[in-house]
Amino acid sequence: MKKVYFIPLLCFVFLFQSCFEVIEEVQMKDDGSGHFNFVINFSQSKTKINSILKMQKINGYTIPSKDEIKKEASKIEALAQSTSGISNVKTNIDLTNYIFTIDLDFQKISNLNTAFLKLKNSRKLDPSLSTDYFTFADKKFIRTQKIPIKTLYEKLEKSDKEVFQTAKYTSVYKFDSTIKSFSNKNSTTSKSRKAIKLNGSIISLINGNEKIENTITLN
């Protein structure tokens, strides 16, 4: 019997079998420190989710209680807080609208990658999966995607694959300095050129039709 809780990228996705949006935001200061915010929003499907939470299991997955969900979020918060260079960790579990949020500050971007690594190890995920998603050096911010998401996707059951068909993602990166250039041409910058945004479809990302990778050079 399968049981899924808060994992690095998709929280309760297979349990809720619902439309969702992932929002990733990084605020980078010139000194390399910054703030990270990650949201998974199921609010469009809250009626369906309320019904699912009354069940014991769905598609082989055990349905956790609301107290169990909160407990797992607390574990994630404690794990991140114990990571060197990470501070002010806050998780918010909105079980009315089903919006799950984690906020934290980092001294340098590598601290954030370390927190992802600790989270991966705590879930006993494939040790070969890279968690080095971000780098920042010499006025260059790089978002990479090294996880073989297509391969992982193909291993899923058909019913699990379906949840990604309408899923969306948004990435927002903000800086003290203005943006000189960026590699992902689907991105758009703010009028001040101190922020850049990328919207897309998760299934298109899985199939390779869209990319989340971006190399952003600052002035």
Language model features: what each stretch is:
Residues M1-Y5:
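Positively charged n-region of N-terminal signal peptides that target proteins for export
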Residues L15-S18:
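C-terminal motif of bacterial Sec signal peptides marking the signal peptidase cleavage site
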